[in-house]
Amino acid sequence: MSIYAHSQQTVSIGPGFFTGKDYLDMTDNERRAYATGAINGMLVAPFFGAPADNVNWLKACTLKMSDEDVAAIISKYIGSQESQLNYNLNVVTFNALRNACPKTK
């Protein structure tokens, strides 16, 4: 799957392990665990060469969120857009958070 990054550069994203439907089939504890892991994974992107500035919006947005808050954002995003059921959950999660978080530079 390809998405547009902040700089409008097209990047290719691997499929990950789950789809939006898989997420909705998870228990609440599994959703919270997934949400925690997804945030942790995104926050270490600079270890893999991503500019630290690219995750500042995520740090600011999720600073005071609980795992339940993040899981609810993902659930609401998938639930409000049926097309998300068949998409790769890693990309759906990013888009859900980007949609829920204020845009910052």
Predicted regions mapped to residue ranges:
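Globin-like tetrapyrrole-binding proteins
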Residues: 38
